């Protein structure tokens, strides 16, 4: 809760069944009213083009707005993404951890070149929690779009630095990948990340790479929003500290 607020300051079973035919040869299931859920998710999956990897600097997501207020400056691509999200999210206009897990794992099924054990529900709950500005346990449109853009950018970085095409990043590749994603880390923090997210051989698979960057991005943004005088120091109470560390 505290983390999410700090960041903003500076139909589950039916979906699962529909996703079964996504990216496969089977037909797509239609929900009542003619909604083609597979097509909706497919549109979201293909929303971000496969651009070349580039330097990425973490930025705060846009502040939460009323979902029906579509700014005139929005591109046609974003409008289409918003429409697809509306149908995917359902009446509450938010996507939960289970939906996110299904979407991410279906995306992974397209990329056989990425070594991964898949995104677990616990991992997706953690991802949702650091992005959840209103503590509903779900992601609204702006939050989801921000996350999705980052995942696609980081996927490009991951593939660029997997130079031996092993599907995972070794210790010699990981440091460069983190820097290309926009994170300059000291040796102590780098070693902590390796111990937390890599395997015993020091290799990191795709889902752990994304989980690591989501957390890094969120913590950098949280610190920046709390460091109001920009002196590189923050002061928090025990209550704020517990909220910051427990709901993430």
From Swiss-Prot:
The lineage of its organism: Eukaryota, Metazoa, Chordata, Craniata, Vertebrata. Keywords: Calcium, Cell membrane, Cytoplasm, Membrane, Metal-binding, Repeat. Ca(2+) 2 binds at residues 132, 134, 136, 138, 143. Ca(2+) 1 binds at residues 89, 92, 94. Ca(2+) 4 binds at residues 117, 205. InterPro entries: EF-hand-dom_pair, EF_hand_dom. Ca(2+) 3 binds at residues 162, 164, 166. GO terms for molecular function: calcium ion binding; calcium-dependent cysteine-type endopeptidase activity. Pfam families: EF-hand_8 (PF13833). PANTHER family: CALPAIN SMALL SUBUNIT 2, CALPAIN, SMALL SUBUNIT 1 A-RELATED. Calcium-regulated non-lysosomal thiol-protease which catalyzes limited proteolysis of substrates involved in cytoskeletal remodeling and signal transduction. This small subunit may act as a tissue-specific chaperone of the large subunit, possibly by helping it fold into its correct conformation for activity. This is Calpain small subunit 2. Heterodimer of a large (catalytic) and a small (regulatory) subunit. It comes from the Eukaryota. PROSITE patterns: EF_HAND_1, EF_HAND_2. Its main location: cytoplasm. The keyword Cell membrane applies. It is found in: Cytoplasm; Cell membrane. GO terms for cellular component: calpain complex; cytosol; plasma membrane. Residues 119-152, 149-184, 185-213, 214-248 form the EF-hand domain.
């Amino acid at each position: 809760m505290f983390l999410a607020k700090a960041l903003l300051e500076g139909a589950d079973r039916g979906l699962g069944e529909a996703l079964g035919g996504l990216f496969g040869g089977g037909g797509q299931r239609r929900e009542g009213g003619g909604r083609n859920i597979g097509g909706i998710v497919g549109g979201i999956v293909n929303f971000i083009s496969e651009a070349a990897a580039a330097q990425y600097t973490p930025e705060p997501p846009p502040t939460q707005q009323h979902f029906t207020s579509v700014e005139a400056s929005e591109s046609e691509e974003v409008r289409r993404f918003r429409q697809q999200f509306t149908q995917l999210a359902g009446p509450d206009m938010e996507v939960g951890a289970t939906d996110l897990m299904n979407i991410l794992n279906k995306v992974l099924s397209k990329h056989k070149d990425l070594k991964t054990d898949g995104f677990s529900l616990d991992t997706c709950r953690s991802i949702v929690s650091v992005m959840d500005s209103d503590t509903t346990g779900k992601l609204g449109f702006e939050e989801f779009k921000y996350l999705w853009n980052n995942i696609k950018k980081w996927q490009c970085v991951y593939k660029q630095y997997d130079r031996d095409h092993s599907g995972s990043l070794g210790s010699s590749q990981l440091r460069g990948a983190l820097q290309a994603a926009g994170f300059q880390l000291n040796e102590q923090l780098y070693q902590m990340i390796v111990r937390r997210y890599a395997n015993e051989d020091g290799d990191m698979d795709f889902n752990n790479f994304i989980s690591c960057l989501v957390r890094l991005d969120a913590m950098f943004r949280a610190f920046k929003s709390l460091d109001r005088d920009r002196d590189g120091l923050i002061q928090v109470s025990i209550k704020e500290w517990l909220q910051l560390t427990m709901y993430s």
